[in-house]
Amino acid sequence: MTQANLSETLFKPRFKHPETSTLVHRFNHGAQPPVQSALDGKTIPHWYRMINRLMWIWRGIDPREILDVQARIVMSDAERTDDDLYDTVIGYRGGNWIYEWATQAMVWQQKACAEEDPQLGGRHWLHAATLYNIAAYPHLKGDDLAEQAQALSNRAYEEAAQRLPGTMRQMEFTVPGGAPITGFLHMPKGDGPFPTVLMCGGLDAMQTDYYSLYERYFAPRGIAMLTIDMPSVGFSSKWKLTQDSSLLHQHVLKALPNVPWVDHTRVAAFGFRFGANVAVRLAYLESPRLKAVACLGPVVHTLLSDFKCQQQVPEMYLDVLASRLGMHDASDEALRVELNRYSLKVQGLLGRRCPTPMLSGYWKNDPFSLEEDSRLITSSSADGKLLEIPFNPVYRNFDKGLQEITDWIEKRLC
């Protein structure tokens, strides 16, 4: 089946699909606070989703392309679930967030199919995969159209990997008590086994969102990157996120001695946002298997336990948390009680001495991750490093921060 036909088959209208912003029914919606964050983007009036320009540009999307798609959404006069929010158009049609981003992805998919240069074709496939992931963002459970966009993203990513430098292997990992999960092992040129970074991504991202991290930072240093999806999304969608947030990643770590391309004696974990919750748990629970753990904007305690902090984050992010926890109809009070159990300090881990070297990078005044959380991580480690990343200029400092983190990881792996 051709890619175009696959797209048509997946998105063929069958019934009235639920609109993304209606999937989580929290009772205590408050006023939307203005938020700006390097890792999560910013709240913009009249948009349900946070607009994450930095990360989308970092993943290879042209800023003008972002504005073009946003303009098509804004200009639509189709029915919306909330007339005050542009990105709530009902149904898979013009103006709908998923429709417009998926349509943009198909443009690049067609370019990829027509391209004779394999490497350039690989770039086009990767571009399409990224756009399909933006279409599916923020990846709420039960969003049928988003899940179809994710399927197309994974397919485009596999096509890209066949054409881009290095090698990617799709791997299946067995997890007792449930369905197996699929991960992607990205390997640089040369002979393995390679030192490897196990990526622990944020709750509003897919494992295929981190190719730029591998290509620009790990591959040039001869380091492989292994990704899996976080519980409840993508290839890990059959697993619910629980207080044992590191369960899937632990089983992957335990399987690495049987993976011939990975040097299981030289493995580090890298956690973005809530992925840092996973990575820090691994530092405590699997310290013999890890040489180092790095975190960026970690969500490990304050946001999970402090009501005032939770009031400062956007509705969309609270919806993502509720969706991952399977609490689609919960009040904010019920959600708050449950989130508290995910705090690594409440769990009795953070604050105890940890033998694993840990680095934590943070931005001042980050509403999702306070400086205190990063200090708690690094002060708990026998070999801790605290890294403050200045906000402006945001892109340059983000790149510089990632370079410093990669240098730190490399010294402990190589």
From Swiss-Prot:
GO terms for molecular function: carboxylesterase activity. Its EC number is 3.1.1.1. Keywords: Hydrolase, Serine esterase. It catalyses: a carboxylic ester + H2O = an alcohol + a carboxylate + H(+). The keyword Coiled coil does not apply. The keyword Hydrolase applies. InterPro entries: AB_hydrolase_fold, FrsA, FrsA-like, FrsA_esterase. Pfam families: FrsA-like. It is an enzyme of class 3 (hydrolase). Catalyzes the hydrolysis of esters. Belongs to the FrsA family. PANTHER family: DIENELACTONE HYDROLASE DOMAIN-CONTAINING PROTEIN-RELATED, ESTERASE FRSA. This is Esterase FrsA.
